[in-house]
Amino acid sequence: MNPGIDLQGSFIELLTNVGLPPGVAKAVWMPLPMLLMLVGATIGVLISVWLERKISAAAQQRIGPEYIGPLGVLAPVADGLKLLFKEDIVPANADAALFTLGPILVVIPVFLSYLIVPFGQNLLISDLGIGVFLWISLSSIAPIGLLMAGYASNNKYSLLGGLRAAAQSISYEIPLALAVLAIAMMSNSLSTVDIVNQQSGLGILGWNVWRQPVGLILFWIAALAECERLPFDLPEAEEELVAGYQTEYAGMKFALFYLGSYVNLVLSALMVAILYLGGWDFPIPLNLVASWVGVSETNALFQVIAGAVGITMVLLKAYFFIFLAILLRWTVPRVRIDQLLDLGWKFLLPVGLVNLLLTAGLKLTFPIAFGG
């Protein structure tokens, strides 16, 4: 198997060749992955917001953002700057400490989850053995922040929105975890890199989507509910709750909720690409491509091109699902709260359990095809 590009080793070697001591070179490297993660996730959010505006406009036969930059690409940046300079208001009867802590608790766990998202064999910040388990654990922290924000606002609409967010998250966290467990069972690992490697070698035919079609649908529905996307945006339903738990927020605190929502959507789409669509894997096996071109897989130029193609593949697969999520907003009506909970507990949970048991049975019966 192609070992991929050792980004950390190459960077440290480059700095030591320039004349820096190895210790200093390692110290320079340490903050760079985190900075890259923050910048990359923020750019991903800006692209998603722009896509949402343009696709929504097309669905309604409008033009959408047009004048702020080419094709309106700078409109999300303008929104962020506007919110940055708006007054930060704390309601008179609110609990100021919890009111401030709420949006922080929502955003930080989502950004931390990007630690285990691989864009290539070695193109990730931390290849943890408990990768997907860490992601599910961190995603369960955000609802605490939403509930905290709703309670601290001292507003009935905010409180109802926070309670809805907590109920929704609990209802859909379990089906999501069951779908991930089925993938982990086939891969014999919780590491995101191992999960992608288990799908490599056969190109598109080796991807988990063919072995886990029900799991993919289950995962995506649960992920949309976790991201509070339509038709599951009950915690902030405008017609019912003004803006839900965000009602009393303004300025940067409101922007943090907005940012957290889209960062979570991009993260969920990336996880679909990694768990079910082969991650950075190209639809045609790279060893075949290398033999057709007439170069070795270990060729430095081929590795660089393969790394760039891998990053592109992950992003294309992820943004395809973001496109689907945006289309769903304008094609599916919002469900009622009882329908939302019934779907989670009475349908997705049993389907997830059956899918997990079926995967275990198939793994024992067909160990080669199902990662025995």
From Swiss-Prot:
Pfam families named among the record's database cross-references:
NADHdh
UniProt-recorded name of the protein? NAD(P)H-quinone oxidoreductase subunit 1
Q: Which GO terms describe its biological process?
A: aerobic respiration; photosynthesis, light reaction
What cellular component GO annotations does this protein have? plasma membrane-derived thylakoid membrane
Spans through the membrane: 27-47, 97-117, 128-148, 166-186, 204-224, 254-274, 308-328, 351-371
Role of this protein: NDH-1 shuttles electrons from an unknown electron donor, via FMN and iron-sulfur (Fe-S) centers, to quinones in the respiratory and/or the photosynthetic chain. The immediate electron acceptor for the enzyme in this species is believed to be plastoquinone. Couples the redox reaction to proton translocation, and thus conserves the redox energy in a proton gradient.
Q: What class of enzyme is it?
A: translocase
Name where it's found: Cellular thylakoid membrane
What family is this protein classified in? Belongs to the complex I subunit 1 family.
Whether Secreted counts among this entry's keywords is no
The EC code for this enzyme is 7.1.1.-
